[in-house]
């Protein structure tokens, strides 16, 4: 059992307030730092840290002292793939409820996808997102803007970047037109920003609902072949080869074949990155039999070989980061037959404990796993976060690495509860989330 509390981020910590974090195991994945020590913040910045920071005692001028009780103090997590449904589908999620869920999961920065209603393809909608974030968020809100407008012409990418877009995607749908994609890649290279693709050939997926394979055959359902993903990955990488300084990112990669193509592109020196969701390296198509529509997402859960390939991709570095594809849906959209239920699951409050299974079962070193959740996603979107460094923004979390608990969707801060991980026993609990020096979430474990 645990008691949770939240506080809105607003403008972050008061500029002159100093906070000392003591008795911490400080981990910074980028520098491979893993020490016992203390850390000092002032306002929204990290001032200093180290094993001997308060060797002569804590100065009386410190405004607040937080005892980490030998738990881990690490950079706040960064999730570059969330759907907060605002504007247009606020009955499923809002920036307020989604960011509240993120804070509970130790995520201090999220990137909202642009498939809202209307899409983030205009400056007006982009400014609305920024306004709502300032009014109602618990964490940092970034956003991708749309590659295309409703008429399939390119968005004004330069203008949208100017008002804050950290990249461009049509996520939820692929950019099917190869010429449009080539133009988008070309323009993005001039803007020094990332193009992120939902890799799916709609002609091949053909309105399928789960992975094409033994389970789809058993259930008599139309399947989505894995080649529907890899064929778009292959096409887009071919398109980018003659464009200088272009960065292409594949969202929620799910197939072994896609990883083979990505590995080859990286070996050729192309700037190709990709992400994987926790559900794609934890579950398979067989989980459909247990969880039904709660295990329906796009791309679909695939085979055990694909799942193991995702883990190998994380271990080898072919996969750059973990992202949730947090896709909230109300109960009416999910409690339907598999062929008509909505795609997607929520994931913000389970991302860290599910990912930590790879550490607890001996698959990945802790510091390598945490890299995929902190500075690596930060670098994809070019934001100066995800690190513990002097003068860096104080986005931090305190993690009880070994605390065991059971996922309970009724306790989720998200408006929606569509998760296949309900009742799963996990290990690793976020005790405090600090954004710009300000505590926005606390969990008090009640024994």
From Swiss-Prot:
Zn(2+) 2 binds at residues 171, 198, 252. It catalyses: (S)-dihydroorotate + H2O = N-carbamoyl-L-aspartate + H(+). It comes from Ehrlichia chaffeensis (strain ATCC CRL-10679 / Arkansas). Binds 2 Zn(2+) ions per subunit. Zn(2+) 1 binds at residues 81, 83, 171, 325. GO terms for molecular function: allantoinase activity; dihydroorotase activity; zinc ion binding. Pathway: Pyrimidine metabolism; UMP biosynthesis via de novo pathway; (S)-dihydroorotate from bicarbonate: step 3/3. One of its GO terms (cellular component) is cytoplasm. The active site is at residue 325. GO terms for biological process: 'de novo' UMP biosynthetic process; purine nucleobase catabolic process. Its EC number is 3.5.2.3. PROSITE patterns: DIHYDROOROTASE_1, DIHYDROOROTASE_2. Keywords: Hydrolase, Metal-binding, Pyrimidine biosynthesis, Zinc. The keyword Nucleus does not apply. Substrate binds at residues 83-85, 115, 298, 329, 343-344. This is Dihydroorotase. Belongs to the metallo-dependent hydrolases superfamily. DHOase family. Class I DHOase subfamily. The keyword Hydrolase applies. It holds the Pfam family Amidohydro_1. Catalyzes the reversible cyclization of carbamoyl aspartate to dihydroorotate. Its cofactor is Zn(2+).
